[in-house]
Regions:
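Active-site loop of classical SDR/Rossmann-like NAD(P)-dependent oxidoreductases
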Residues: 39, 267-279, 293
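Beta-loop-alpha module in the N-terminal Rossmann-like domain of NAD(P)-dependent dehydrogenases
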Residues: 21, 51-109
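N-terminal Rossmann-like dinucleotide-binding module
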Residues: 1-50, 180
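Contiguous beta-strand/loop segments that form the cofactor/metal-binding neighborhood of enzyme cores
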Residues: 177-250, 275-288
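Hydrophobic residues in well-ordered beta-strands that form the structural core
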Residues: 57, 94, 119-121, 145-146, ...
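C-terminal helix-rich "cap/oligomerization" subdomain common to oxidoreductases
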Residues: 1-3, 68-71, 282-317
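Rossmann-fold dehydrogenase core element
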Residues: 107-124, 140-146
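Predominantly a Rossmann-like dinucleotide-binding segment in NAD(P)-dependent oxidoreductases
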Residues: 125-194, 199
Length: 317
């Protein structure tokens, strides 16, 4: 069998998350990290020197030199940057949420289809090792409960705290929305949502109850004002209950048996979700496969997040 071909990759945006994209790509045997681009040219030059690559002066220069690129810029720039890359025939992995609006998300999906390029979206939790076990053992979930809690981001001079350019639904909860839509695989029939701003200008804590067409109910809480971090999901099926911890990559499975309830430890091979995500993206480019989290999947999660936000602010329609 021939060796996988080397993919020429660039990273656009080398802030808190993009720096890790650059680190991981620089260590991948199947990747040539061609270069980085960031509006902060000094930052790009610093990271480029660290990883033995170059800093490009413009986005267009980077786009003309690569086959694939990661986009890790503020959400309001996702559409502009990803569009520029797609129009030059570059395969794109854009961070979540896919875009700032559903219209922008749908436009990116359309552009990628027309240009015949891969559009993957960085819902990194889909690559958490616990997800494989969850997908295998949570067929036909009946009730789902998810909690995603984080401390408020530290201040940045002259900038919003990281992530607070959007509300907590688009910042944190959207991870769980995308996973739950994937697990249930049915349309949402009803949404009931509440949320309040506490430390920022938009909702910092939110709760939503989703009712799906098949009767499954999901209750989801997200907060970025918690003193501690938590990323957990509990899934109840007809004959089992799974409690999974994304953060610690651990979990428990409880099954009904003829003697009562049997408890099992969840066998999970731990790994770095971001590295697994980038490896999957590179394989998709090599093989021209459909990504695990496509633009269409991410746009569906964004539509639901937008409806949740609308309802928090205006009430049920």
């Amino acid at each position: 069998m021939s060796e996988p071909r080397i993919i020429r990759v660039g990273v656009v945006g080398v802030g808190a998350l993009g720096q890790h994209h650059a680190r991981i790509y620089s260590q991948m045997e199947s990747v040539q990290l061609v270069g980085l681009y960031d509006a902060d040219r000094a930052r790009a030059a610093e990271l480029a020197a660290k990883h033995g690559t170059r800093a490009f002066d413009t986005l267009e220069q980077l786009a003309d030199a690569v086959e694939a690129a990661n986009v890790a810029v503020p959400t309001h720039l996702h559409h502009e940057v990803a569009s520029a890359l797609i129009q030059r025939g570059v395969h794109v992995l854009v961070e979540k949420p896919i875009a700032a609006t559903t219209q922008e998300a749908e436009d990116l999906v359309r552009q990628a289809q027309e240009k015949g390029v891969i559009l993957q979206v960085g819902h990194v939790e889909r690559f958490n090792p616990v997800l494989g076990f969850l997908e295998e053992h949570a067929a036909k979930p009946r009730f789902i409960e998810a909690h995603r809690l984080a401390p408020f981001p530290p201040p940045r001079e002259g900038l919003h705290p990281r992530g607070t350019e959007v509300n907590v639904v688009l910042d944190l909860m959207i991870h769980d929305l995308e996973i739950i839509l994937h697990l249930v695989g049915e349309p949402v029939r009803d949404v009931r949502a509440v949320g309040v701003p506490v430390l920022s200008g938009s909702e910092d804590i939110a709760n939503v109850r989703l009712l799906f067409e098949n009767g499954c109910v999901a209750n989801i809480t997200a907060s970025r004002i918690s003193p501690e971090r938590m990323r957990k999901i509990r899934v109840f099926t007809e004959d089992a209950y799974l409690s999974l911890d994304y953060q610690n990559q651990a979990g428990e499975l409880f099954r009904k048996s003829h003697t009562g309830i049997a408890r099992e430890e969840v066998p999970i091979e731990k790994g770095e979700p971001l590295a697994l995500e980038l490896q999957s993206f590179v394989r998709c480019v090599q093989r021209r496969d459909r990504p695990v989290v496509s633009g269409e999947h991410a746009a569906e999660a964004l539509r639901l997040a937008v409806e949740i936000t609308r309802q928090m602010r205006q009430g049920p329609s």
